[in-house]
Amino acid sequence: MTGSTASPPEPSAPPADSPFAPVTQNDSSPTSDSTETMSRIPTGIKVPDVVANIDTAQVAAKVESFKKWTIGTFKNSKQQLLEHMGKIDKTVDPEFEAQCEVLKDIHRRYGLVVAAAKNFSHVLTQMAEAEKKLSESFYQLSMKEEQIKAQCTMTSETMRGVGEQAASLDACLRYFISSMETVYNQTITDTLHTIYNTESARIEYDVDRNDISAATNPPQGQLTKNLPVGATEKCEEKKAKYEKLKNDAKIKMRLLEENRISVVAAQLEKLQSALAAYYSGNAKLLEASVRELSFLQSPQPSFIPTM
């Protein structure tokens, strides 16, 4: 052995057919930009018939309509924001707006009545079922307990009658709920829709009115702008639309005030009779109330005429 260490032998190259052999670039192989590769790409793309048959005029009209809608929505939103900030004036009818606010509050309170009545009806339904089950359980007990059979039978009959009365009151209450839902969800809501449409028409009118005012009476130091063709006529048309909708809303509110009171008062009388009969234990009067309601027709969707 010598003191020097021999260096490790250099690894030999793997055979050419080995999978570990390095890949050599063949100049004759096609490159990414070669003619062979490009020949695989189609020279032309066929346009589908659906795309080829598109009516460009119709598309342009829809785009123009969408453009007008976008501009109008932006102007209306800007008008509402400036009104809220107190930086622009708006058309005001204090009496009409006060009536609208009163109706909105009445509508909210009717909603509370409907929700509470539905909750009461749910409780009555559960109570009637519980009373019937208790009646049945006492009857089953009377079949086995001969010594207290009379007491069990009497209690069973009492609970059965109480359960039937609860079911009868629930039937009267459900008719009352149906009538109140008609007033709440249809009659008052129909009038509120007219009020909301009136408010939208008022905003559109104020947008054009303020645009005309800003163009004809610019701030000091600014030049007068030319109005678009037909701007004044368009503003007058929107004013007429607003006035018509406001008049329709006033008529509907007046008719609603006249008819709502009479309809709701009649329903309250029927409900009061049913409640008095139930809590006084007058089963015959309660049954009479149920029979009376069964002969009544369903309330009309609305007693406000369509305008």
Curated annotation (Swiss-Prot):
Protein name in the entry: Uncharacterized protein F54C8.7
Superkingdom, natural source: Eukaryota
Sections of the chain in a coiled coil: none
GO cellular component: mitochondrion; trans-Golgi network membrane
Disulfide feature: none
Domain AH: 91-291
Pfam families recorded: Arfaptin
SUPFAM superfamilies membership: BAR/IMD domain-like
Region listing for Disordered, in residue ranges: 1-42
Gene Ontology MF term list: phospholipid binding; protein domain specific binding
Compositionally skewed regions (Polar residues) per UniProt: 23-40
One GO biological process term: IRE1-mediated unfolded protein response
Composition-biased stretches (Pro residues): 8-17
Organism: Caenorhabditis elegans
Alphabetical list of PANTHER family matching this protein: ARFAPTIN, ARFAPTIN-RELATED
Biological classification of the source: Eukaryota, Metazoa, Ecdysozoa, Nematoda, Chromadorea
